[in-house]
Protein backbone atom coordinates (compact mmCIF):
# COMPACT_ATOMS: atom_id res chain seq x y z
CA UNK A 1 0.00 0.00 0.00
CA UNK A 2 2.81 2.45 0.83
CA UNK A 3 4.03 2.25 -2.77
CA UNK A 4 0.63 3.32 -4.09
CA UNK A 5 -0.86 5.65 -1.49
CA UNK A 6 0.26 8.44 0.80
CA UNK A 7 -1.71 9.06 3.98
CA UNK A 8 -1.64 12.54 5.48
CA UNK A 9 -3.34 13.13 8.83
CA UNK A 10 -3.65 16.44 10.63
CA UNK A 11 -4.90 17.62 13.99
CA UNK A 12 -7.71 20.15 14.02
CA UNK A 13 -7.19 23.19 16.21
CA UNK A 14 -7.60 22.19 19.83
CA UNK A 15 -6.53 18.61 19.03
CA UNK A 16 -3.22 16.82 19.48
CA UNK A 17 -0.04 18.83 19.21
CA UNK A 18 -1.38 21.43 16.78
CA UNK A 19 -1.51 24.95 18.18
CA UNK A 20 -2.76 28.05 16.42
CA UNK A 21 -3.52 31.68 17.09
CA UNK A 22 -7.16 31.30 18.11
CA UNK A 23 -7.51 27.88 19.74
CA UNK A 24 -11.04 28.55 20.99
CA UNK A 25 -12.65 29.28 17.61
CA UNK A 26 -13.97 25.83 16.81
CA UNK A 27 -16.83 27.06 14.65
CA UNK A 28 -17.84 25.02 11.63
CA UNK A 29 -16.67 27.74 9.23
CA UNK A 30 -13.25 28.01 10.87
CA UNK A 31 -12.70 24.25 10.93
CA UNK A 32 -13.83 23.92 7.31
CA UNK A 33 -11.45 26.69 6.25
CA UNK A 34 -8.61 25.08 8.25
CA UNK A 35 -9.28 21.77 6.48
CA UNK A 36 -9.32 23.46 3.07
CA UNK A 37 -5.98 25.15 3.80
CA UNK A 38 -4.48 21.77 4.68
CA UNK A 39 -6.02 20.27 1.54
CA UNK A 40 -4.51 23.04 -0.62
CA UNK A 41 -1.08 22.40 0.92
CA UNK A 42 -1.40 18.68 0.24
CA UNK A 43 -2.41 19.40 -3.35
CA UNK A 44 0.71 21.52 -3.77
CA UNK A 45 2.93 18.79 -2.30
CA UNK A 46 1.29 16.05 -4.39
CA UNK A 47 0.21 17.95 -7.50
CA UNK A 48 0.23 14.82 -9.66
CA UNK A 49 -2.05 12.82 -7.34
CA UNK A 50 -5.76 12.28 -6.93
CA UNK A 51 -6.82 12.94 -3.37
CA UNK A 52 -9.52 11.37 -1.21
CA UNK A 53 -10.60 13.03 2.03
CA UNK A 54 -11.44 10.77 4.99
CA UNK A 55 -13.10 11.99 8.18
CA UNK A 56 -14.44 10.42 11.37
CA UNK A 57 -17.17 11.77 13.66
CA UNK A 58 -16.79 15.57 13.93
CA UNK A 59 -13.92 15.32 11.44
CA UNK A 60 -16.25 13.51 9.05
CA UNK A 61 -18.79 16.28 9.34
CA UNK A 62 -16.15 18.93 8.66
CA UNK A 63 -14.71 16.83 5.81
CA UNK A 64 -18.15 16.67 4.19
CA UNK A 65 -18.60 20.42 4.39
CA UNK A 66 -15.03 21.10 3.22
CA UNK A 67 -15.48 18.79 0.21
CA UNK A 68 -18.73 20.56 -0.68
CA UNK A 69 -16.99 23.93 -0.52
CA UNK A 70 -14.02 22.68 -2.56
CA UNK A 71 -16.25 21.25 -5.30
CA UNK A 72 -18.54 24.27 -5.19
CA UNK A 73 -16.74 27.56 -4.58
CA UNK A 74 -13.33 26.33 -5.76
CA UNK A 75 -14.32 23.93 -8.56
CA UNK A 76 -12.53 25.90 -11.28
CA UNK A 77 -9.18 25.84 -9.51
CA UNK A 78 -6.61 23.21 -10.47
CA UNK A 79 -5.96 22.08 -6.90
CA UNK A 80 -9.69 21.51 -6.30
CA UNK A 81 -9.88 19.09 -9.24
CA UNK A 82 -7.52 16.75 -7.37
CA UNK A 83 -10.36 15.86 -4.99
CA UNK A 84 -11.63 12.50 -6.21
CA UNK A 85 -13.51 11.15 -3.23
CA UNK A 86 -14.80 11.48 0.30
CA UNK A 87 -15.10 8.79 2.98
CA UNK A 88 -17.06 9.66 6.10
CA UNK A 89 -17.04 7.30 9.07
CA UNK A 90 -19.47 7.30 11.99
CA UNK A 91 -21.35 10.52 11.28
CA UNK A 92 -25.13 10.54 11.26
CA UNK A 93 -26.79 13.91 11.74
CA UNK A 94 -29.84 12.53 13.56
CA UNK A 95 -27.98 10.46 16.14
CA UNK A 96 -25.31 13.14 16.62
CA UNK A 97 -27.95 15.82 17.19
CA UNK A 98 -29.90 13.52 19.53
CA UNK A 99 -26.77 12.98 21.64
CA UNK A 100 -25.95 16.67 22.08
CA UNK A 101 -28.18 17.23 25.14
CA UNK A 102 -26.14 14.58 26.98
CA UNK A 103 -22.71 15.82 25.94
CA UNK A 104 -22.32 18.35 28.74
CA UNK A 105 -22.87 15.61 31.35
CA UNK A 106 -20.40 13.34 29.57
CA UNK A 107 -17.76 16.08 29.44
CA UNK A 108 -18.20 17.15 33.07
CA UNK A 109 -18.03 13.55 34.29
CA UNK A 110 -14.46 13.17 33.00
CA UNK A 111 -11.65 13.47 35.56
CA UNK A 112 -10.15 16.98 35.34
CA UNK A 113 -6.57 15.72 35.72
CA UNK A 114 -4.40 12.62 35.80
CA UNK A 115 -1.21 11.72 37.67
CA UNK A 116 0.45 10.03 34.69
CA UNK A 117 0.06 9.29 31.01
CA UNK A 118 -0.55 5.67 31.97
CA UNK A 119 -3.60 6.76 33.98
CA UNK A 120 -4.86 8.71 30.95
CA UNK A 121 -4.58 5.54 28.85
CA UNK A 122 -6.33 3.49 31.56
CA UNK A 123 -9.14 6.05 31.71
CA UNK A 124 -9.61 5.73 27.94
CA UNK A 125 -10.16 1.99 28.30
CA UNK A 126 -12.30 2.10 31.47
CA UNK A 127 -14.55 4.85 30.14
CA UNK A 128 -15.14 3.02 26.86
CA UNK A 129 -13.70 5.92 24.88
CA UNK A 130 -11.26 3.46 23.32
CA UNK A 131 -11.78 -0.29 23.09
CA UNK A 132 -8.25 -1.70 23.06
CA UNK A 133 -5.02 -0.89 24.84
CA UNK A 134 -2.90 -0.24 21.76
CA UNK A 135 -5.43 2.27 20.40
CA UNK A 136 -5.62 3.95 23.81
CA UNK A 137 -1.84 4.29 23.94
CA UNK A 138 -1.92 6.09 20.59
CA UNK A 139 -5.06 8.20 20.90
CA UNK A 140 -5.31 9.22 24.57
CA UNK A 141 -1.96 10.94 25.36
CA UNK A 142 -2.37 13.67 22.70
CA UNK A 143 -5.63 14.67 24.41
CA UNK A 144 -3.78 15.92 27.50
CA UNK A 145 -0.90 18.26 28.28
CA UNK A 146 1.59 18.18 31.14
CA UNK A 147 1.15 20.89 33.74
CA UNK A 148 3.71 21.42 36.51
CA UNK A 149 2.62 22.81 39.86
CA UNK A 150 4.80 25.85 40.62
CA UNK A 151 4.81 25.17 44.36
CA UNK A 152 5.24 21.40 44.61
CA UNK A 153 6.99 20.83 41.29
CA UNK A 154 4.77 17.82 40.60
CA UNK A 155 3.47 17.19 37.11
CA UNK A 156 -0.11 16.35 36.33
CA UNK A 157 -1.89 15.90 33.02
CA UNK A 158 -4.93 17.99 32.15
CA UNK A 159 -7.21 17.93 29.13
CA UNK A 160 -5.69 19.66 26.11
CA UNK A 161 -8.99 21.24 25.09
CA UNK A 162 -11.75 22.67 27.26
CA UNK A 163 -14.61 20.83 25.58
CA UNK A 164 -17.26 22.84 27.41
CA UNK A 165 -15.88 25.97 25.78
CA UNK A 166 -16.70 24.39 22.40
CA UNK A 167 -20.37 23.83 23.31
CA UNK A 168 -21.61 26.81 21.23
CA UNK A 169 -20.25 25.02 18.14
CA UNK A 170 -21.53 21.48 18.72
CA UNK A 171 -24.76 21.82 16.76
CA UNK A 172 -23.03 23.49 13.81
CA UNK A 173 -20.60 20.59 13.44
CA UNK A 174 -23.38 18.11 12.67
CA UNK A 175 -26.39 20.08 11.43
CA UNK A 176 -27.11 19.90 7.72
CA UNK A 177 -25.41 16.59 6.94
CA UNK A 178 -28.48 14.88 5.50
Model-predicted segments: where are they?
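Active-site loop/oxyanion-hole signature of alpha/beta-hydrolase fold enzymes
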Residues: 2, 8-54, 68-80
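Conserved catalytic loop of SAM-dependent methyltransferase domains
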Residues: 135-157
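Short "lid" loop at the C-terminus of a central beta-strand within the Rossmann-like core
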Residues: 14, 92-95, 146
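Conserved serine/cysteine hydrolase catalytic core
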Residues: 149-178
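Helix-loop "lid/cap" segments that line or gate small-molecule binding pockets
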Residues: 104-109, 119-131, 143-147
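Flexible "cap/lid" loop of the alpha/beta hydrolase fold
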Residues: 64-68, 75-119
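Gly/Ala-rich beta-loop-alpha elbow adjacent to hydrolase catalytic centers
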Residues: 55, 59, 63
Amino acid sequence: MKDTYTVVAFDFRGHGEHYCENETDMSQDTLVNDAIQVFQSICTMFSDRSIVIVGHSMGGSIATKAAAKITGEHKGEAWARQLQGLFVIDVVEGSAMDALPFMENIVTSRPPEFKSLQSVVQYGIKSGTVKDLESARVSMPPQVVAKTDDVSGTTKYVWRTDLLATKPYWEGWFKGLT
